[in-house]
Amino acid sequence: NVVANGVNLNKFIGMERDYTFRRKFAMDNEKIILFMGRLVNEKGVQHLIAAMPKILAGYHDAKLIIAGKGGMIDELKAQANALGLGSKVYFAGYLGGKDVEKMYKAADISVFPSTYEPFGIVALEAMLAGVPTVVSDVGGLNEIVEHEVDGMKSYAGNPNSLADSIVSLLLNFW
């Protein structure tokens, strides 16, 4: 039988956090907020970057890692620079193979701020890796996370709502 939209349940069994890998992206005291996916408008990364000043006001030792590639990369980098986020946002580029799994294990929070998302395999993978997850209240993401039970939801396209959910996890989960 084929299971549509499934994930390999054995993918992260026995896998520990690789601190050497993690230190490529953040200092030990920093909490990694991870976005992994295509850098296109509907993935909502621009809203996550817009949320960072409020996130940092609520939790200074946070760092956003953006892993992926896509047509918005230059626009997103310019947005981060315009907001003065400098060392608090890191563009990791495309990750493949075992680096994807290592990055999930390195993350403290994963965020999927899509404005349109039919399903959201990446959110399932993050949750399977044991990473607290924030998703938008749209499409399939809305169906896989129960707010404040197995993740947090935020209003799609709303940086303030996104920041509130992320800061809540940073302050209360860790």
Feature-to-residue mapping (PLM):
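Conserved acidic donor-binding segment of nucleotide-sugar-dependent glycosyltransferases
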Residues: 147-148, 152-159, 168-174
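Carbohydrate-associated surface elements
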Residues: 6
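Nucleotide-activated donor-binding/catalytic signature segment of Leloir-type glycosyltransferases, i.e.
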Residues: 75-95
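Short alpha-helical donor nucleotide-sugar binding micro-motif in glycosyltransferases
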Residues: 94-95, 102-107
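Short hydrophobic beta-strand element within catalytic cores of glycosyltransferases
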Residues: 132-135, 145
